[in-house]
Amino acid sequence: LAVISALATALACYPRLSLWLNRSAPVWYLEGTVFLCGIVLWGFVFAWHTPYTRRPVFLLKLELGPFVTATVAAIIASAVFDLVLDPLLRSRIPQDYPDDLEHWFAFLLFSLALTQLFLLFAPFDWLMRLLKNRWAATNLTVLFGALVLAMRIQSLPTQLPPLLFAALLTVRIVMGFLAVSFYLRGGILLIWWWTFLFEARHLLNLNE
C-alpha cells in the first residue's frame, strides 16, 4: 500500500516539478526521489497511525462536526492570507504564487500529495510511534512545520521584515495545531479538503 501511495504521490508531483524552471536536477531524478522517500513516509502512516491513534487513516464517512469546523477554519485562514499576508508575500516570494490555472492545479496537487505527507502525516505518526504520547507528538509536529517554514524564509534572497515573519510563523503554528486535530478527527480526507479550500484562495488572483 505504501508503494502504491508513493507512486501516486510522485505522479501528482510531476506537474509542479515539470513547471519548476530553476530546478537543480532533471525531472526524472526528482520524481524518483519523491517516489523512494514517499515509500518511507507512507510506510510510517500506514504502519503506525491506526495502532497508535486508534483512528483510521482514511475516514470515508466524515462526521459533521469536524467537517464543518475544518471548512470554517479553512475559509478564515484563506481570508487572513488573502487580505493580509498574501499581498505582502506575493512580491517577495512570487514563485510561491500561481499565475494561471495550470500552475494553480500543479501547486494544489503538490500540496495534497507531498506537503501534507511530509509536514503532517508522516512526522506525527512517527512521533506517535516513538513517544506514544499524543500531546508531545502534536507539539513536535507543529514545531517541525514551524522550523521548516523558518528555514524556507531564511533561504530567501531578500529577508522578510521581522513583523511579517512573526505574523506568518504565528499563523502557521495555529494552522499546524488545527491540522493535527483535523487529521486525528477526520483522517487524510479531511486534511485534503482543508488544503483544497485553503489553496482555492489563489483562484481569485489568477491572471487567466
Where are these regions (language model features)?
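Functionally important transmembrane alpha-helices
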Residues: 159-208
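Alpha-helical transmembrane segments in multi-pass membrane proteins
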Residues: 1-46, 104
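Function-critical hydrophobic alpha-helical transmembrane segments in multi-pass membrane proteins
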Residues: 96-147
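Short aromatic-rich membrane-water interface segments that cap or initiate transmembrane helices
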Residues: 27-33, 99-115, 170, 175-177
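Interfacial transmembrane-helix boundary/kink motif in multi-pass membrane proteins
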Residues: 1-2, 25-34, 52-79, 137-142
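Central hydrophobic cores of alpha-helical transmembrane segments
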Residues: 4, 138-148, 189-202
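Juxtamembrane "helix-exit" motif on the non-cytosolic side of transmembrane helices
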Residues: 12-22, 83-92, 151-160
